[in-house]
Regions:
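Short, active-site-adjacent cap segments at secondary-structure transitions
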Residues: 35-36, 122, 189-192
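Short, surface-exposed acidic-centric catalytic microdomains
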Residues: 61-63, 67-68, 92-151
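C-terminal capping/extension of enzyme domains
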Residues: 1-10, 49-60, 128-171, 190-261
Length: 261
């Protein structure tokens, strides 16, 4: 992986499962890692950027712990103001949603889950592009000796380009986990991982109704049968930003009626 940098100089790092003892109960596959977000204030406490991605998450599906210390460790020239944690709902929302709205209803804990993403690094989503552009314009117009922010945009073609290689890496993690149950978060893990082993390519292919949502399916991967539970992306389940109200409603009902083991 090339070296990429966040605003104010933190290097992009891979975010992968670190607690790798086997015999996990469930393997969870998402899309790409999130980031630590800061609010950027000028020296008069005026907000320059409400939420600026400034570092890789400290752990996969991070839930926001220690955000103050992470941001305090990022140095910023005094003339450029200061960084403070972004609004509470902007650090660790996917991790919190995964724990509260996916794992707990299924009877699992984070400690007994092996977590994985199709892309094990942060990417810039459309909402961040404007913030990154503003940072780059500010630091290139003056002599602050800060690196230009270069975190790549999220591009589904990157998933396609690396799909075969990542498939093998994900299978290796799956086998190392010892889990026999797989939870897939949204369309992209189905299209760019599961489709190597199954004809379906998106969540609605498993059923497009409340009755079919969240059902368990037996799928063979490299000669071993796994219980696969395809669910919506945490963004939808937790109604984070732009989301599908239909999937959100189906997920809420699934929690109430089908989520328990």
């Amino acid at each position: 992986m090339n070296d990429y940098y966040f605003p104010f100089g933190q290097k992009l790092t891979k975010v992968q499962q670190t607690e790798t003892t086997p015999n996990k109960e469930v393997f969870v596959l998402g899309v790409y890692a999130s980031a630590v977000h800061a609010k950027w204030l000028d020296n008069d406490n005026r907000v320059l950027v409400q939420a600026l991605a400034v570092a890789s998450e400290p752990e996969i599906f991070w839930t926001g712990e220690g955000v103050e210390q992470i941001i305090a460790a990022i140095s910023i020239p005094p003339e450029l103001g200061r960084l403070v944690p972004a609004n509470k709902n902007l650090n660790g929302p996917s991790g919190k949603a995964l724990d509260d709205l996916f794992l707990q209803p299924l009877g699992y804990s984070m400690a007994r889950a092996w977590l994985c993403d199709l892309l094990p690094e942060s990417r810039v989503n459309p909402n961040q592009k404007k913030a990154v552009k503003y940072y780059n314009e500010r630091i290139t117009s003056t002599n602050y000796h800060l690196p230009v922010a270069t975190i790549p945009d999220f591009d589904v073609h990157e998933l396609e380009k690396n799909a075969a290689r990542r498939k093998d890496e994900i299978v290796a993690e799956l086998e190392a986990s010892g889990a026999s149950t797989i939870v897939l978060l949204g369309d992209l893990p189905i299209r760019w991982f599961l489709h190597f082993f199954d004809k379906r390519t998106k969540l609605s292919d498993f059923g497009n109704s409340q009755e079919t949502y969240g059902q368990r399916h037996t799928i063979s991967i490299h000669g071993k049968d796994y219980t696969v539970i395809p669910l919506c992306h945490p963004r939808n389940a937790a109604r984070l930003g732009a989301h599908s109200s239909t999937w959100a409603e189906w997920h809420e009902t699934w929690i109430k009626e089908k989520g328990k083991k």
